[in-house]
Amino acid sequence: TPNNPNWEVTDISSASELAHKAGAKLIVDATATPPTMTKSLNLGADISFHSATKYLNGHSDIAAGALSFNQQSSMYENLFTIRKLHGTVLNSQDAFLLIRGLRTLFLRVEKNSQNAMLLAKHFNNHEFIEKVLYPGLETHPNHQIAKHQTNGQFGGMLSVIVKGSQTDAINVV
């Protein structure tokens, strides 16, 4: 949460309650909201996963992912065993590159969020744009949920719907 490209935001706490009442686990794709922005596990998620290739690494020069668990469980034990047996561990160079990216994660996410907000506000009043999809805008239908779940930053990605035809949209790009 939020999903791409519509940037709808799931209320993690409410989804967690529903999942747990049904005896299910809540797994959150937190790739677009790294841990410096949103603490998915604190909001009730059982598992949070990230594409470490994106925000966490910051340079797109590795292929990696990360899973975080709210508590040690049988699912954790099973996945840990699979990891051990299949050798799905980062090599030392990729681990170094990931650590390099993590050192600047807070600053990059902060600046990306600021820049995305500026772009969202600019496009929100643009004559060729029908709609801006960005949870940081107060006009976004899930703005209050996003505001509650984040540290006041809303991420560095947004979508726009261009007025007119597909050709018009291609011309804008």
What are these regions (language model features)?
Residues 117-173:
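Conserved small-domain helix->loop->beta segment predominantly found in fold-type I
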Residues 1-128, 133, 139:
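Conserved PLP-enzyme active-site core in the AAT-like
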